[in-house]
Amino acid sequence: MRSPFAPLALAAALIAAAPAHAKPADPAVAKKILIDSVAIPTVEGRGKVPELAAYYAGVLKAAGFTDADIVITPIGETASFAATLKGTSAEKPILLLGHMDVVEADAKDWTRDPFVPVEEKGYIFGRGSEDNKFDVAMMVATMAQLKKDGFKPRRSIILLLSGDEETAMVTTRALAAQYKDAEFALNGDGGGGLIGEDGKAKYYGLQAGEKTYADFTLEVTNPGGHSSRPSAINAIVQLSTALAKIGAYHFAPQQNELTRVGMPIVADQVGGDIGAALKAFAANPADTAAIAAITADPEYVGQIGTTCVPTLVKGGHAENALPQRATANINCRIFPGVEIEAVRAELEKVIADPAVAVKTDPDATASDASPLRPDVMAAVTKAVHARFPGLPIIPSMSAGATDSLHFRAVGVPSYGVAGLFSKASDSFAHGLNERAPVAAIPGALAHWDSLLRDLSK
């Protein structure tokens, strides 16, 4: 198979030869946008997402965007946001993705009020300061700066912000359906760089795939009866047997372009026995020793195939009665490209008991990984290496879902290319005292400016 990086050197050379351009957005402006964004509590149920969308519209209109360039679409108590920087051609547009909503935060558990942004000791504290308002602020600031500069992209650039990515993704689905004819999408809610605790950059991760999140319900029903008269058929026992089979089962190892390209780079980073196993698996996905080593490591087991684990069990209705019903939830993270129904059928085969019904959660959506486009890889390489020369860039597949899931599902290649570089010890997304380093803002702005100018021309 031809390497996805075969045309990369040429593409990178062409990009590097591009003429100098105006400076990225002002870090002070971007910081204000971030702080103002965090101050609006866009948690599900508070109805504040439209307010944040209106704020972003105001920022962009002040830079020269017109009313016709911006569309805010209310959906229930939330909304979606779209802003278009028109291109000079009729070629397919480039999408920028992010989300305006945040997860809930209980003020009594935080050191500071999560919705009163505070700049302290080099950080901006507050819910959403990292996920996802940091890169959203950088994208909004960059779009505004491009407009001010009079930049004329060949391809239109459309900034799309969802309003319920953290929950139902209704706005995400609507945006994906509306903009399914795009060339590709760049998502600020995926990827990004890791800074070591010594302050040195370690690597940059480019997210090009997501495992499908799917829940399956196992259900056994019996007539029941008095516990003093036990029968050979017991719903809890039958369910327990099925769960034991699932717990002992391993889905067949799989490989895709992301693991073939990314695993050897990860292997060089981690070293040791697991590094050797990752490198061996990338070279030969049938290597049983490598499979055994990776399967035994919780950090990497999800990178080589589908995983399914029991997460909830319910059964019985009284202490002195035979159970009439027993259920369990099986949470699966499905390898990109594998159909949800195929996993359900495989679970049924593993259980091998027709008394155990296997039902699929209807909300699950499957999507394949995105191809590693040479133009995207070259642009990301240029942007990252401008900040950290020679830094490893690792194509990756995440276990959690972002808006990219629904865009990939409708055929839009999507790449997580966040501009944020941070230490692992600074990452508190969804957690207490979430924060973002102020020092990361200038580099993130340069990152987005470079990507958008290079990929849209």
Predicted regions and their residues:
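Active-site metal-coordination/substrate-binding segment of hydrolases
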Residues: 91-161
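Sec/Tat signal peptide C-region and signal peptidase I cleavage site
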Residues: 18-22
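N-terminal helical capping/dimerization or prosegment-like subdomains
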Residues: 23-107, 325, 329, 340-341
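Histidine/acidic-residue-rich, glycine-tolerant segments that coordinate divalent metal ions
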Residues: 154-235
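An extended, acidic, His-containing surface patch that forms the Zn2+-binding/catalytic region
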Residues: 89-91, 194-196, 201, 254-317, ...
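Bacterial N-terminal signal peptides
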Residues: 7-16
